[in-house]
């Protein structure tokens, strides 16, 4: 504090010495009536104890002079259209006082905002540094609002991080931090946070974020809270929490544009703030304000990215987007389809409109957009009414360009065609050939393991659903599910299902649990029944679905192999009892492999309260599966 006081006194003495001849005629307030008398501080003020010229100058600072209009210098600065006009003010006889030099630098940064070459030339100009030194000498009397704009301008002008003048302005900002209004702090954070990180001013940035967090209750403007969430929220977890609280408080005042910005910001930072998302969803449903196409697309993206399900919002988004479909670009259609697929929300009229959009622009649509739509359709298991022309277009586009796609994307596309039952032999061969699939064998990353899991599904499709397919196939040694498929945490439904089945089986050799198959699917349980529906020991009989196949005895005539499959809530489309495409593919594969399926969906199991009810439910399911097979 002592060093700070000495610095300020030095600056005041220097200014007082320079302005001393002009003190007497300027420093009085002309009263409308009565004796004209300077209005100075009381005798007990600190300035009254300062000696000589410093005391006179401080008293001069405290004299109130009425504002009679814009000074000529300020007008010249504001009207300047070229940097040279501002630099010439130094030698043209104009007296640059208080904020003038700072305002000139701010205007310089505005004029050069899009001229990086001119910035480099400016920094080499001696007049620029003279102007900067003048600001530094007057830094203590620069107004708060001008000071924060000045710091932002110095960052944008590209001053070196070691510049003493830049550090001086930064230090002045730190000294005044407590006195700055919240809007000044917010402006500085929004406009200069990136520069502070790049310029090595991390201490100033950290202090700024602390003040913003502590004084968050001062935010009263919805524009300010939205802008801060977008520009600075990602820099501080605690600040973002406060901004979310303030946003929740002001959300009733938000218009569609503010709601869009908040949602996109949350999605970009992957922050699933449930109370805020619920409040935004409520206002989207209740308020009748119109939503433009771009806002609708951004809302769909944000909800999809965050995985936040709100049926009424999705219904409004789908209904409002449908009329915009003819005017949408292929990129927007692909993006929107992908967003709704992430949400597992299948709106048939909207998806059919997307298909029609693609067919109407068959010659111009690009393969990446078509691939995104194909993957989205496979996720929600959507089969369009005009599937023949649509998939003909897909195969036509893939014919020569499939091998040019990124390897993981090639697997995704062929897998999606398998889900939708539209894959062709050439596409199977493209990803099952040894030259291609070996790059994914033994992959340790989650992405590589996921891709190889899809290769197992593609291989199973070739074996089970395409009897005319002649190869190639994956090697037998590779037909092993990834460890992650068996290491997943046990769910309550899975645990209860296993406990109930163990009670029904009575003996451990009569059934198996968590059975990995060579098709890439894991069975929750497997049992073997003879013609009398009696349980048989599994280990005694051949099991071709395992890797490697086990057992030596062939199945008795009429024996049936049952697979139990539990279906959790995430396995279904939103607000539907229709399985997602991935799980429909699993059912098809296991049926083609000779299993009788016992489906155990969560919504049926939840209604069973006692162990007796659960046992009776499974027995009834097994009887129905056998009866359906016999009825064929």
From Swiss-Prot:
One of its GO terms (molecular function) is RNA binding. It holds the Pfam family FAST_1. It comes from the Eukaryota. The keyword Transit peptide applies. It is found in: Mitochondrion matrix. One of its GO terms (biological process) is mRNA metabolic process. The keyword Amino-acid biosynthesis does not apply. Residues 562-620 form the RAP domain. Keywords: Mitochondrion, Transit peptide. GO terms for cellular component: mitochondrial matrix; mitochondrion; ribonucleoprotein granule. Residues 1-112 form a transit peptide. Residues 30-49 are annotated as: Disordered. Residues 33-48 have a biased composition (Polar residues). Belongs to the FAST kinase family. Plays a role in processing of mitochondrial RNA precursors and in stabilization of a subset of mature mitochondrial RNA species, such as MT-CO1, MT-CO2, MT-CYB, MT-CO3, MT-ND3, MT-ND5 and MT-ATP8/6. May play a role in cell cycle progression. This is FAST kinase domain-containing protein 4. It comes from Bos taurus (Bovine). The lineage of its organism: Eukaryota, Metazoa, Chordata, Craniata, Vertebrata. The gene is TBRG4.
């Amino acid at each position: 504090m002592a060093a700070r006081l000495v610095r300020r006194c030095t600056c005041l003495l220097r200014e007082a010495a320079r302005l001393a001849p002009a003190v007497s005629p300027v420093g009085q307030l002309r009263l409308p009536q009565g004796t004209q008398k300077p209005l100075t501080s009381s005798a007990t003020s600190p300035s009254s104890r300062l000696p000589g010229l410093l005391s006179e100058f401080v008293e001069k600072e405290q004299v109130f002079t009425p504002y009679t209009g814009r000074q000529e210098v300020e007008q010249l600065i504001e009207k300047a259209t070229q940097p040279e006009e501002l630099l010439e003010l130094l030698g043209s006889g104009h007296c640059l006082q208080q904020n003038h030099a700072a305002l000139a630098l701010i205007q310089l940064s505005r004029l050069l905002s899009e001229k990086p070459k001119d910035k480099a030339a400016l920094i080499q100009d001696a007049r620029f540094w003279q102007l900067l030194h003048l600001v530094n000498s007057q830094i203590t009397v620069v107004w708060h609002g001008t000071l924060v704009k000045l710091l932002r301008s110095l960052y944008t002008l590209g001053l070196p991080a070691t510049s003493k003048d830049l550090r001086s302005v930064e230090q002045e900002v730190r000294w005044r931090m407590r006195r700055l209004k919240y809007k000044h702090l917010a402006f500085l954070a929004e406009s200069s946070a990136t520069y502070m990180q790049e310029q090595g001013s991390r201490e100033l940035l950290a202090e700024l974020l602390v003040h913003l967090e502590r004084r968050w209750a001062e935010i009263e403007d919805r524009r300010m809270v939205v802008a801060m969430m977008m520009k600075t929220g990602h820099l501080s977890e605690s600040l973002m929490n406060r901004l979310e609280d303030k946003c929740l408080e002001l959300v009733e005042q938000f218009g569609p544009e503010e709601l869009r910005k908040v949602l996109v910001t949350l999605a970009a930072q992957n922050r699933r703030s449930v109370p805020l998302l619920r409040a935004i969803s409520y206002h989207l449903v209740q308020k009748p304000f119109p939503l433009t196409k771009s806002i609708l697309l951004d809302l769909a993206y944000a909800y999809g990215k965050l995985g936040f399900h709100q049926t009424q919002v999705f219904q409004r988004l789908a209904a409002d987007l449908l009329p915009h479909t003819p005017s949408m670009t292929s990129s927007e259609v692909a993006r929107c389809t992908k967003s709704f697929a992430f949400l597992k929300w299948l709106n048939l009229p909207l998806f059919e409109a997307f298909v029609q959009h693609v067919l109407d622009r068959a010659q111009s649509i690009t393969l990446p957009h078509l691939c995104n739509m194909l993957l989205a359709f496979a996720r929600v298991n959507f089969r369009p009414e005009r599937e023949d022309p649509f998939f003909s277009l897909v195969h036509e586009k893939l014919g020569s360009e499939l091998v040019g796609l990124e390897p993981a994307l090639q697997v995704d596309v062929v897998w999606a065609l398998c889900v939708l039952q539209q894959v062709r032999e050439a596409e199977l061969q493209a990803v099952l050939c040894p030259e291609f699939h070996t790059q994914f064998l033994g992959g340790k990353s989650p992405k590589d393991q996921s891709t190889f899991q899809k290769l197992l599904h593609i291989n199973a499709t070739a074996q089970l659903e395409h009897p005319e397919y002649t190869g190639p196939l994956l090697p037998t040694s590779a037909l092993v599910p990834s460890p992650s498929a068996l290491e997943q945490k046990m769910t309550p439904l899975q645990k209860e299902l296993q406990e109930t089945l163990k009670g029904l089986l009575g003996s451990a050799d009569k059934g198996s649990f968590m059975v990995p198959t060579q098709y890439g699917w894991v069975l929750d349980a497997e049992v073997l029944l003879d013609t009398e529906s009696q349980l048989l020991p599994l280990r005694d009989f051949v099991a071709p679905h395992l890797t490697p196949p086990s057992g030596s005895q062939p199945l008795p005539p009429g024996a049936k192999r049952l697979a139990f499959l539990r279906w959790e809530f995430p396995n279904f489309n939103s607000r539907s009892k229709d399985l997602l495409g991935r799980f429909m593919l699993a059912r098809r594969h296991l049926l083609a492999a000779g299993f009788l399926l016992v489906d155990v969906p969560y919504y049926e199991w939840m209604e069973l309260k006692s162990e007796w009810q659960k046992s009776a439910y499974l027995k009834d399911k097994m009887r129905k599966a056998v009866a359906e097979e016999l009825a064929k």
